[in-house]
Amino acid sequence: VLAYNKDKQLTNANSVTKENLRNYLSMFRMLTDAVNIKNGFIVNLGVDFSIIPLPGYQGKAVLLKCIARLKQIFKIDQWQMNEPIILGNIATELDEIEGVQTVVELSVHCKHDKASGYSGNYYDIQSATKNKIIYPSQDPCIFEIKYPQSDIRGKVVTF
């Protein structure tokens, strides 16, 4: 189980919340069942991408639209525990933005520096990626972009 802080960022649920949940669930359990409530792991991410804008479009304006769309895609309300990240779907979402000719690069990396406010949970994104799908760990975890203003970085490429 996880909770939100005042900025709608994920955090571990406090013991009172877990105890209340345990009491509520105990009304529905069988006599031999046990209720074990654990915190999920928060894996903080950063996203880097590059786009080529269509001729006649302002690169910076198109880039800002792409960043806004990524913020929307990674809004924490849209995600569930143990949901994989399908990079192809994200690239398609960016490709569909008006003014984007193509997405040149799209990469996701782990942000785990506790001193910078991240969860401290390191996750090897490269090893967990197969066929452009980032799979979560077997332990309950959720992917989060904690600071969208700085964790989503894009650039315009021209040839």
Residue ranges and their predicted role:
Residues 1-159:
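Acidic, low-complexity glycine/serine/threonine-rich segments
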